Amino acid sequence: MTAVGEALRRCRAEGRAALVGYLPACFPDVERGIANLQALLDGGVDILEIGLPYSDPVLDGPVIARAADVALRAGSTTAAVLRTLEAVAASGAAAVIMTYWNPVEQYGVDRFAAAVAAAGGSGLVTPDLLPDEAEAWLAASDAHGLDRIFLVAPSSTDERIALTVRFCRGFVYAASVMGVTGVRERASVQAPELVARVRRYTSLPVGVGLGVGTAEQAAEVAQYADAVIVGSAFVRCVFDAGDDAPAALRKLAADLAAGVRRMPATG
C-alpha cells in the first residue's frame, strides 16, 4: 500500500474524510513552492496533490492557469517538480503528482514513473488520460508500485465509470461539477449522486474535487465522500497573501481540516 493508501486508511479509521490539498510545484518559485506545500501539511492536509505546471492547462480555471504560468516563468521543469516531490515526501508526506499527460509522454512514461517512485511519490492524478488509452501508464504504474487516479464526472456514463474505476488504484477522483477548476459558492448538488454511482462499481475511496473552498463546503462534502480535494482556494490564497502565504495557507488548511472533522448535525 502506498503512503496515500495508508493516509486514506488512517482517516477512515478516525471516522472522517481525508483532506487533499493541491498546489502547483514551483509556485511562485521552487523553494517557496516547497514551503507552501509544507504549510498545507502543517495546517492539517492529509494528502498533497502537487501540480506539474503545463503551458496548455485546458481543464484548469483562470486561477490555477495563472499559477501555472507564474511557475513556468520562474523556471519550472519536470526535474524541479520531482525535486519538490522528493522534498515533501522526505518529511513523511503522502503525495501524488497531478499532471496532464503530454509532459509525461515527453519525459518517457516508464522513466517518469520510476522517478516519481524514487522521489517517494505515491502515484499520479491524470485528468486528461482515459484508462483505455493508458496502456503504457498501466504497465509503468504496475512496475513501480504507483497509484493510478483517473477522473469521473457527472457526465460519465455508468459504463465509463465502471471501466474507469476498474483501472484506478489509490482512490477515484470524482470531479463534482462540469467545466474547469475553480471555487464555487456552493458545493455541487451533483456530487453526492456521482459518488453513489461510483460506489456501485468499486470499494476504492472516492475523493470529490472542483469547487470546495470553505470549511462549510468541506464539512458538507465530507458527509458523503472519502476525501475532500481543495485546489483553487489554496492557489488563490497564495496570490492574495504574497510573502505571508505560508501562514495564510496554514490557517486556511486548518479551517478546512476542522471542516472535514465536523460531525453532521442531528435531529
Swiss-Prot record:
Output the superkingdom of the source species.
Answer: Bacteria
What is a single cellular component term in the Gene Ontology annotation? cytosol
EC number(s) for this protein?
Answer: 4.2.1.20
Which keywords annotate this record? Amino-acid biosynthesis, Aromatic amino acid biosynthesis, Lyase, Tryptophan biosynthesis
Taken from the UniProt record, the cysteine pairs bridged by disulfide bonds within this chain are none
Reaction catalysed by this enzyme: (1S,2R)-1-C-(indol-3-yl)glycerol 3-phosphate + L-serine = D-glyceraldehyde 3-phosphate + L-tryptophan + H2O
Q: Which Gene Ontology terms cover its molecular function?
A: tryptophan synthase activity
List the HAMAP family hit by this protein, alphabetically: Trp_synth_alpha (MF_00131)
Listed under subunit, the entry gives: Tetramer of two alpha and two beta chains.
Name of the protein in question? Tryptophan synthase alpha chain
Give the source species. Acidothermus cellulolyticus (strain ATCC 43068 / DSM 8971 / 11B)
Q: Name the encoding gene, please.
A: trpA
